[in-house]
Regions:
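Beta-rich, blade/repeat-based domains predominating
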Residues: 9-22, 31, 50-69, 92-116, ...
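Beta-propeller domains
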Residues: 26-45
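A short loop-to-beta-strand structural motif that recurs across blades of beta-propeller domains
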Residues: 33-35, 74-76, 124-127, 167-169, ...
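Short loop/turn segments that connect beta-strands within beta-propeller blades
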Residues: 38-42, 79-83, 129-133, 172-176, ...
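A basic- and aromatic-enriched beta-loop-alpha substructure that forms the phosphate/nucleotide-
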Residues: 64, 70-76, 80-82
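C-terminal closing repeat unit and adjoining cap/tail of repeat-based domains
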Residues: 206-275
Length: 275
């Protein structure tokens, strides 16, 4: 695995990673820690804690972080500049979060959040929190433990990994009841990132593997670690700014972040302005 190396160490089983608009790298921990990471120096600073268990993270245009806390069953918002930590969403009025897993913004400030539901209970859904903070059930097309998600480059589709199907699917933003299967997978897929060629990078909880899926569904394994030391439950990844040619991958099974260079360029995340 010559394209894969340990980037930084000293984190508590980090599942989620994200990059803010200014290029700052953040990660979460299994005791609710929010970490700020400097890839150039290897410095890891814990800047806050929710007291729960963090899964996915993303950032808005002002650099505030939106963190899925599975223990609290809430999406929390944290301002790294002012230190304010608050509850952003507990789910919709008629359906509370069961397992809020991964958040992704669109350009209009809508936050799509996968609610995985129970393991193998086929009761997951995707919620949407609009820019005013109102939460609704957006789609029930994906029920098989919807996990990581990513908005397409054109903003017209949401890519979702279903851990228990297992499959990579796509839901058109304008047709939330539609579920298009891009590829049937094996193992337990967890997170997804997209590149500028329309390919999806799939990160697995089990086995310790990273695949690349072409738009036509062809699957290529890019890295696998039978020992589970360099890649250890590599659950999610994010492209490092500014060039977005390096993927930073979480290691839920250990205490480090991994850097991967697969000869590709990632798409830029959305950073909308939220009141």
């Amino acid at each position: 695995m010559t394209a894969v190396r340990v980037l930084v160490e000293g984190l508590d089983h980090p599942e989620g990673v994200t990059v803010a608009a200014d290029g700052t790298l953040y990660a979460g921990g299994e005791a609710g820690q929010i970490y700020r990471v400097d890839p150039s120096t290897g410095t890891v600073d814990q800047i806050a804690t929710t007291g729960g268990f963090l899964l996915g993270l993303c950032a808005d245009g002002d650099g505030r972080l939106y963190c899925c806390d599975v223990a609290r069953r809430e999406v929390m918002r944290f301002d790294p500049n002012g230190g304010a930590l608050l509850v952003y969403s507990t789910g919709s009025p008629d359906r509370a979060f069961v397992n809020p897993n991964w958040p992704a913004f669109d350009d209009n400030g809508n936050l799509y959040v996968t609610d995985s539901g129970g393991w193998k209970e086929d009761n997951g859904c995707i919620m949407r929190v609009d820019a005013t903070g109102t939460t609704t059930v957006w789609s029930e097309a994906s029920t098989a433990f919807p996990n990581g998600c990513a908005l397409s480059a054109d903003g017209l589709s949401l890519y979702v990994l279903e851990s228990t199907a297992p499959a990579l699917i796509r839901i058109p933003i304008g047709e939330p009841d539609r579920r298009d299967v891009i590829a049937s997978l094996s193992g337990v897929p967890d997170g997804v990132a997209l590149d500028t060629d329309g390919r999806a990078y799939v990160f697995y909880y089990r086995p310790d593997r990273i695949d690349r899926v072409d738009p036509d569904g062809a699957i290529e394994t890019l890295a696998e670690d039978p020992e589970g030391t360099l890649l250890s439950a590599p659950t999610n990844g994010v492209w490092l700014e500014p060039d977005r040619t390096r993927l930073v991958v979480g290691s839920l099974g250990r205490w480090h972040l991994t850097e991967c260079d697969f000869g590709a360029t990632g798409i830029r995340l959305r950073y909308p302005t939220i009141p």
